[in-house]
Swiss-Prot record:
It comes from the Eukaryota. The modification Asymmetric dimethylarginine is found at R498. Interacts with CTTN/cortactin SH3 domain. Interacts with STRN, STRN4/zinedin and MOB4/phocein; this interactions mediate the association with the STRIPAK core complex and may regulate dendritic spine distribution of the STRIPAK complex in hippocampal neurons. Activation of glutamate receptors weakens the interaction with STRN and STRN4. Residues 386-396, 1624-1638 have a biased composition (Low complexity). It is found in: Cytoplasm, Cell cortex; Cell projection, Dendritic spine. Residues 1-23, 203-222, 367-440, 454-478, 498-614, 1448-1483, 1560-1663 are annotated as: Disordered. This is Cortactin-binding protein 2. Pfam families: AAA_lid_NAV1, Ank, Ank_2, CortBP2. GO terms for cellular component: cell cortex; dendritic spine; FAR/SIN/STRIPAK complex; glutamatergic synapse. Residues 1645-1663 have a biased composition (Basic and acidic residues). Its main location: cytoplasm.
Amino acid sequence: MATDGASCEPDLSRAPEDAAGAAAEAAKKEFDVDTLSKSELRMLLSVMEGELEARDLVIEALRARRKEVFIQERYGRFNLNDPFLALQRDYEAGAGDKEKKPVCTNPLSILEAVMAHCKKMQERMSAQLAAAESRQKKLEMEKLQLQALEQEHKKLAARLEEERGKNKQVVLMLVKECKQLSGKVIEEAQKLEDVMAKLEEEKKKTNELEEELSAEKRRSTEMEAQMEKQLSEFDTEREQLRAKLNREEAHTTDLKEEIDKMRKMIEQLKKGSDSKPSLSLPRKTKDRRLVSISVGTEGTVTRSVACQTDLVTESADHMKKLPLIMPVKSSTGSPLVSANAKGSVCTSATMARPGIDRQASYGDLIGASVPAFPPPSANKIEENGPSTGSTSDPTSSTPPLPSNAAPPTAQTPGIAPQNSQAPPMHSLHSPCANTSLHPGLNPRIQAARFRFQGNANDPDQNGNTTQSPPSRDVSPTSRDNLVAKQLARNTVTQALSRFTSPQAGAPSRPGAPPTGDVGTHPPVGRTSLKTHGVARVDRGNPPPIPPKKPGLSQTPSPPHPQLKVIIDSSRASNTGAKVDNKTVASTPSSLPQGNRVINEENLPKSSSPQLPPKPSIDLTVAPAGCAVSALATSQVGAWPAATPGLNQPACSDSSLVIPTTIAFCSSINPVSASSCRPGASDSLLVTASGWSPSLTPLLMSGGPAPLAGRPTLLQQAAAQGNVTLLSMLLNEEGLDINYSCEDGHSALYSAAKNGHTDCVRLLLSAEAQVNAADKNGFTPLCAAAAQGHFECVELLISYDANINHAADGGQTPLYLACKNGNKECIKLLLEAGTNRSVKTTDGWTPVHAAVDTGNVDSLKLLMYHRIPAHGNSFNEEESESSVFDLDGGEESPEGICKPVVPADLINHANREGWTAAHIAASKGFKNCLEILCRHGGLEPERRDKCNRTVHDVATDDCKHLLENLNALKIPLRISVGEIEPSNYGSDDLECENTICALNIRKQTSWDDFSKAVSQALTNHFQAISSDGWWSLEDVTCNNTTDSNIGLSARSIRSITLGNVPWSVGQSFAQSPWDFMRKNKAEHITVLLSGPQEGCLSSVTYASMIPLQMMQNYLRLVEQYHNVIFHGPEGSLQDYIVHQLALCLKHRQMAAGFSCEIVRAEVDAGFSKEQLLDLFISSACLIPVKQSPSKKKIIIILENLEKSSLSELLRDFLAPLENRSTESPCTFQKGNGLSECYYFHENCFLMGTIAKACLQGSDLLVQQHFRWVQLRWDGEPMQGLLQRFLRRKVVNKFKGQAPSPCDPVCKIVDWALSVWRQLNSCLARLGTPEALLGPKYFLSCPVVPGHAQVTVKWMSKLWNGVIAPRVQEAILSRASVKRQPGFGQTTAKRHPSQGQQAVVKAALSILLNKAVLHGCPLPRAELDQHTADFKGGSFPLSIVSSYNTCNKKKGESGAWRKVNTSPRRKSGRFSLPTWNKPDLSTEGMKNKTISQLNCNRNASLSKQKSLENDLSLTLNLDQRLSLGSDDEADLVKELQSMCSSKSESDISKIADSRDDLRMFDSSGNNPVLSATINNPRMPVSQKEVSPLSSHQTTECSNSKSKTELGVSRVKSFLPVPRSKVTQCSQNTKRSSSSSNTRQIEINNNSKEENWNLHKNGHLEKPNK
């Protein structure tokens, strides 16, 4: 290596690198680099790397010495002292490098030459090393590949040998198995034949068993019906006997009690006493059954104890009376709240439990079980007395009842309920709980009875209570005491009457009862607050007469006030609030709130709510030392826990001293509706206004509070709404009207909180402080807004109350109104301009409060209610416009106005970080959350302090709402492409149908979208092909991929998203949500594969014919080439044939053949020559000499029923069956020339016949064609209409299937049943030519909410299509055996009067049985449309009869020989109500006559055949007989249809509101006549529409209701007269049900006359 460098520079051979260069040269001569091994190359590389490192060191050292060498070289030999040397130096430096040579050798040049040489050698060495390494690697790889190939070659060779051996064995085994299988196939074929033979035998046996089973079921059904009828008769008889027994026992008991009373009276009269006036008159026990003594005491919390003692012996007539509520005085000296109610004995009812009857008699002693009461503090509540089966208060001293006495059961209200609801035990006819005494008694007797009824406990003058004996005690001493007490009470009554009576010194007000013998009457029935020192003044006068209106039940007021309970505005006004385990009933819904029923004697007895009478001061004189106790109760539920302070007492306990000289009357303004609360008190304070409301719980704290000075009195008057007292106090001088109690409640606050608008107005006009706050910072406006008193709110706002005042907790009036859902108050505050964004100390806003209660109206007002432009001058028009849609239903508010609240308020978070949306979502208030979501500024992703979003805390419903917040609803439609013109029967088929709407969310992926589309299609196909009304949700659990009609996701040809094509499984770069929005796709269209693709999926969906059947039809056409489709007219034959031809054409074209469709319509003038020309011109018939072409021809012959098949096709049958040149046929052309032709195999012939069955000579053609029969009672026609109409309904509802009870579903089901039952009846009549296919019913209109449109369409279809076809079919059948000389057409053109009668009868029967029956329209609406149907009036009046006695038995069914329609299935599609068990029919003798047999005895069926005894009279003005046997058969069939089990129950169709009068005739033959009084029906005066009849005629009164909610259609069918007896029995028996029928049987009548008399009314014959 060094040699190369040395040769270039021989002068450097003595350099220090010569040694290394010589070594390298020697090494190169010794070896070549290319031959080195890998290890040697590595070693050489390391040596060279070391050498390079050494050279680098040398270079660095030389660089270090470079400066020194340079200086030495340049200046070493010069001396600076010599200027000439310096000049020489400068000369050398200034000259060029090439001109001057250094004076001495330059070591730097040597170094640079060495460095350049080393670099070159290094580059060459590295290149050689890289090449060597690459070659080495390539070599090693090739060696490895070679080894691998060799191994694989060896393996393959070995495997090949193994496979050769195995193949030889397999071939040998296959040969053996082929031989064995060929033998087995022969054996299996033989076995199959045997099994098929056995199967046929089993089928025959099974059919026989099925027939026997059906007969057995029929017999069992009849027997079961008979048993049920007998059981019902036995039940009725037992109930009658039991009722009779009860009456007798009751009568016996009454007589015994009368005897006992008479004996007692005789004994009392014998003893002779001065106390006779205390004895009440003898009364029947029936006037007083239950005597209840209701006592209330007042403790720490006033409670009412009601104890009942029931003194009724066993009663047998199930008659109960309401308890007679008797006032009882207290047994202690403490104050009592006496339930001083008037006695109540209500009218009897029969629904009390029998267990109440068994009670012991106590000899009419009332006071025997009056409990002695403990001290007031021990009293507990017994609401409405002890419950059934329990005893009274365990602390009472009630003696135990005897063993034969039941505990008290009648629940008498201790506090009479204000909501006029009777106790549930009594089930009274009168809804009032406590009516007055028995209404049948004289008022004076009532007064006397009430006056002289003694109290159980009467306090003496000192307040001490003595236990007095009962009022009817036989002791003369007790009677004397009682008389003395009565006299004393009357004296006190007269003395105090001028203070207590409202009409003292004044003329009596209208409506007041007449005065009695005591002078003026004190109030009666008022629950009084008494002290032990005040005499009772409420005895001795008669109770008031009960009002006529149930809502104004004059019951005693509760002994403590009604509590203001904050309840939801949606709650009913008559619900009670539960207070201390005691139900306090609220005001009755019929009375305005605040108009209490007080002092029943002074109220006008009117049926409308009355305002309170003019008030008078009602003062009682209290002795010295007796304080007037105030009633104290606790207020429960009056304020939420979040707002302390509003439920505190209003004043402290204080004494009250009022002069006893105040007695005046003053008039006041009518009290507002919300200003009064029911209550009762006789205290001095509250009676000043003329009624007795007790003190509100606001003013009470704890126990009894004595009333104190004027400021407290002012507060109490304001709290109660006592306007008279309040105005009186306000007129006094020096009274502080702004005085507040210890809680800070002022009089204005109390009045505003309790909603006393008049008091508020008085106080405000007296300049009370409008913004005075209590200790919690609540102002009167806060209290009124919280309680919902909007009139007080409006009044306070008008007096400049601070609408934005915040309490200590930051609650503003708006916040409190929202918290309690008071919509009117919110509206008033918003209109006044209140601030919506004030926050509480907890960070809650009014929006939080409204959402927290779930009140949608409050939230809408907050978000959308705008402040009127003119400030407080807010008129009604602005009000209406600003409350835009609080009741607007589904309309979105953003379409009307935008929210007025900012996004900051909507998204404001409280102390916990929760926004209003958090609260709504967590509580499940979906409506509130939806309103919040409508605000564009809502941030649903905002997180609370626990890092939770709205979605995280939401309920499932709210999560669904949030997920669908921005979802796109894209309708999914199915398209079948273009449908051919309407002449193929496709005019009613729809091209596109909307099946559902897909919800596409932001997070929806393309896979989810594909699954959703596939699932929606599958669900839709299953829903429309199901048997019932399915919704899309109902079928999601069904995992089957194919529906009943054979369609699935595989039937899709293409899908377009808007206008962009897409396929299932395909994905785009954008998500489905972004893709739909960007492309503005308004719908997704699914196109089904159709005939153009050689498929029939679109045909299946358009026609609802199952895909399997369409494919089978196509296979028949391809296999047999000659196919004719036949069925009733309207069976879509033309459409099916054309679609099959299109599909076949495209299939042939796809196979490479040219194809053509030739269509010909056959009419009556279509001749055989025209058909020949058609065959020849279309190249179906080819001359024998001519070779066939490859072109395919499809010929369609439509309407073949219009010509004779045998005449038209007779000459073509043989060549069509054998298509070859070997069987030619000679045809003569029109020019007279004859030529041989044959049909080639590429010709397909299809025909259509609109006829249910072939007859006569046409049957000769049958064996030469493949026939496809489209039967109306078999698939595909059987379910086609149902599937089509269901799909139509789904499309009308935009993919949402309605519920089965929806009116649209009912009207569609009715249209479907009309088609099925119409065909069933026509098949039964033997008129197959009148059968209808479903095509006519495909146009059934589906208009939600307008069912009458469908009925009108049905009437047009009946008049235009059905009735003419039926008329023609009936006439043609009735004239089959007419004189041979005249043709059938003659009979049709000129029908006889008998034939006209039969036609009219048939039309009427069909209309009522098949069309009008089951129509879901109400009867009133249906009657309006009945006149539109032709033939519904059945105008026949017929008198003659015919008899078939001379007919042979077998002739009755002769007309059926031409009827090939299946009769077995005629009742298959009858509605469920048609298959009711026949209660009186023994059975039908044969299919021709279904004889009505009223005798349930089986021996009757063994008599002479009823066929010869049946007669039907169809009479016209003159006597005429039916002209032919077929007419007779038809008449019998019509009669049989009326009584058929398989058809609808015609008797059930008759509307019970018609006046049905049925008379018995004298003699053995009952005759039925009917008078139908219904002005809505089109019946002329001279005609009468005959009644419908089934096996049992339904006789009910005018109040009977339609069964099962289906309106019945009036029937116009004749009624057999053997059903008359039941009517008279049922009309005599009012208590029997309509299901219990007793039929009187006349075994002597063998004939049933169907009478349709000319006159509408028959005289009732004399019996």
